[in-house]
Design a protein with these regions (language model features):
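Hydrophobic helix-and-loop "lid/oligomerization" segment in the mid-to-C-terminal part
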Residues: 1-97, 102-137
């Protein structure tokens, strides 16, 4: 039952996951990672937003990662943002700042702008929390 619910994926879901992982980029000294799937890629693979479930979690479980960001394009310069963290970053605070919500370790929001601008805006908030944690250590 667990395999069917959590692990079983279609071939195209596996393809888009592979692409997201392959094109992911680490930043903030390798403590954070992001990946983006564009609408054209979703169309190419014949997937919809439900097929993207779990990608952000696959990014989060990479060794050394504290915070993962996954974006998928919903329109021109419009992105659905999924945020996950392991132990330090409160992603609900970041999502709330941008009009979204969620929990301490899993949150999301919708943002406008280029991928570069969206990731820069999010990374500034992540960096702030990582700096605070460093100062308190």
């Amino acid at each position: 039952i667990i395999d069917g619910s959590f692990y079983k994926k279609t071939y195209m879901q596996s393809q888009i996951l592979g692409r997201a992982l392959l094109e992911s980029i680490t930043f903030l000294d390798g403590r954070c990672i992001f990946s983006v799937v564009r609408k054209k890629d979703m169309d190419f693979y014949g997937v919809d937003k439900s097929d993207l479930d779990g990608i952000v979690d696959q990014l989060r479980v990479i060794d050394g990662i504290e915070c993962a960001i996954f974006l998928y394009e919903t329109g021109i310069h419009q992105f659905k943002v999924s945020l996950r963290s392991n132990s330090i970053v409160d992603v609900s605070r970041i999502a709330a700042y941008f009009g979204g919500g969620g929990h301490v370790r899993a949150a999301g929001c919708t943002m406008s702008g280029s991928v570069h601008d969206v990731v820069n805006n999010l990374s500034a908030h992540i960096a702030e929390q990582l700096e605070q944690e460093k100062a308190n250590a």
